[in-house]
From Swiss-Prot:
The lineage of its organism: Bacteria, Pseudomonadati, Pseudomonadota, Gammaproteobacteria, Pasteurellales. Keywords: Iron, Metal-binding. HAMAP family: CyaY. The keyword Nuclease does not apply. GO terms for cellular component: cytoplasm. One of its GO terms (molecular function) is ferric iron binding. One of its GO terms (biological process) is iron-sulfur cluster assembly. InterPro entries: CyaY, Frataxin/CyaY, Frataxin/CyaY_sf, Frataxin_CS. Involved in iron-sulfur (Fe-S) cluster assembly. May act as a regulator of Fe-S biogenesis. This is Iron-sulfur cluster assembly protein CyaY. It comes from the Bacteria. Pfam families: Frataxin_Cyay. Belongs to the frataxin family. It comes from Actinobacillus pleuropneumoniae serotype 7 (strain AP76).
Length: 101
């Protein structure tokens, strides 16, 4: 994957997240600034998703901790093979919201 494809794939993830939050009518603010997507919950807690261009990775930080994801076999996964979406659903739950991607 080249850098342009990387940015396109991450932006698709961010778009999916925004659309799902809107579809579910969740009270979560979504802000995207440069390489960082911030999801802010009612209690002011946050999930941060950011691009790590140098490594072509997607990083997720939440109350669960921090995780790194590489794009392999058409999906974002950790080194252990766990999907980004599974981690994100758990992070939402830890922040008090139920969502399914």
């Amino acid at each position: 994957m080249n850098v342009a494809e990387f940015h396109q794939k991450v932006e698709q993830v961010w778009q999916q997240i925004e659309e799902k939050i809107d579809d579910e009518a969740l009270s979560i603010d979504t802000e995207i600034h440069g390489a960082v997507c911030t999801l802010t919950f009612d209690d002011e807690s946050q999930i941060i998703i950011n691009k790590q261009e140098a490594m072509l990775e997607l990083w997720l930080a939440s109350k669960l901790g921090g995780f790194h994801f590489a794009f392999r076999d058409c999906e974002w996964v950790t080194a252990e093979g766990r999907s980004f979406w599974a981690h994100l659903e758990e992070a939402f739950a830890r922040h008090g919201e139920q969502i399914s991607f």
